[in-house]
């Protein structure tokens, strides 16, 4: 079993206040320890919250992030705090989704990353936002993101 060096982490195991904005949030990474092996890491945030930049009303999404590491893993507590920092952040659905993906790509330089953000309806229209860095590595198992298309009461 590989022992992961966590000595450089500032949030894991510490009491940390919730960042007031995504810009303040500190994303941290740890070495993957499995170089040469392609595998998929999935994070699911079924209760993601941000604010509408126009009305200040809350927006809710079910977000699924999949990535194939290339040396680095995102430290999950820092990711949780980063995602929670959007709770008081006003931005459109598309902006939130792409900002999350780009911050992770910048931090990790993964072989591949995709994000699916399934936003709950506002004004009667659900908005789903999808983005990925390119084609996934050949041979990796990519399960469906598992979020059904919004049907309302149909």
UniProtKB/Swiss-Prot annotation:
Q: InterPro entries given for it?
A: GTP-CH-I_C/QueF (IPR043133), NADPH_dep_7-cyano-7-deazaG_red (IPR050084), QueF (IPR029500), QueF_type1 (IPR016856)
Q: What GO molecular-function term can you cite, just one? A: preQ1 synthase activity
Protein residues bound to substrate: 74-76, 93-94
User: What GO cellular component entries does it have?
Assistant: cytoplasm
Name the SUPFAM superfamilies on file.
Tetrahydrobiopterin biosynthesis enzymes-like
- Alphabetically list the UniProt keywords: Cytoplasm, NADP, Oxidoreductase, Queuosine biosynthesis
- Tell me the active site: 52 (thioimide intermediate), 59 (proton donor)
Subcellular location as annotated: Cytoplasm
Q: Does the keyword Oxidoreductase apply?
A: yes
Q: Which interval of the chain is the signal sequence?
A: none
Q: Which GO terms describe its biological process?
A: queuosine biosynthetic process; tRNA modification
Q: What does this protein do?
A: Catalyzes the NADPH-dependent reduction of 7-cyano-7-deazaguanine (preQ0) to 7-aminomethyl-7-deazaguanine (preQ1).
Entry protein name: NADPH-dependent 7-cyano-7-deazaguanine reductase
Organism of origin is Rhizobium meliloti (strain 1021)
